[in-house]
Design a protein with these regions (language model features):
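A structural motif detector for short, solvent-exposed N-terminal "entry" segments of globular domains
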Residues: 1-55, 117-125, 143-160
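A short linear-motif detector with a strong N-terminal bias
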Residues: 12-15, 27-30, 62-65, 106-110
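Eukaryotic short linear interaction motifs
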Residues: 43-44, 56-58, 93-94, 138-139
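Short aromatic-acidic-glycine turn motif
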Residues: 53-66
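Solvent-exposed beta-edge/loop recognition patches
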Residues: 65-160
Length: 160
């Protein structure tokens, strides 16, 4: 039997996720993002990014907390090869304090928050990000697992 894969499943996928470094404040929330790569010229109308956090509580049958992070509008015509970088921060903050990477060509930058006060840091180790189509089908999923920060070597005082 042939493997059947509907076209919806090949339109886009999660490319990468970049959680904010520890110690980042809300003002720096734009440094945290997730990238979605478009693989087919198509319409991503009502596709959404979902954030899930496992709560690991025995008393809860399905110990998961979730929220919608970003929704593509309707219609949302996209081209193959486009990369959407969805920042956790604010569009207003980006306009007034652009990060050097925001000015680089080749990515479409979108923001979860409009006003600066609505920005938040959301991605922590062990969270999941899902790309969900308009019908609620999970198209792609990624686990947030940033590299651990390496401790800085301590300098030993010179002996005389």
């Amino acid at each position: 039997m042939a493997d059947f894969r509907p076209v919806e499943a090949t339109k886009a996928r999660i490319l990468s996720i970049h959680p904010a470094p520890s110690g980042t404040t809300i003002e720096g929330a734009n440094a945290e993002w997730i990238e979605v790569l478009v693989q087919l010229d198509s319409d991503l109308a009502n596709w959404r990014l979902q954030h899930l956090r496992a709560l690991w509580r025995e008393e809860v049958a399905k110990p998961v907390e979730w929220e919608w992070v970003y929704t593509w509008g309707s219609p949302s015509f996209v081209r193959s090869g486009e990369v959407y970088r969805v920042h956790s921060g604010s569009r207003m903050r980006a306009a007034s304090h652009a990060l050097p990477d925001d000015l680089a060509p080749g990515r479409k930058h979108v923001y979860v928050a409009g006003p600066v006060a609505a920005a938040k840091l959301m991605w922590v180790r062990g969270d999941y990000a899902r790309l969900v189509d308009a019908f609620g089908t999970v198209i792609d999923e990624i686990v947030v697992w940033p590299e651990e920060e390496k401790p800085k070597p301590q300098e030993t005082p010179a002996r005389r």
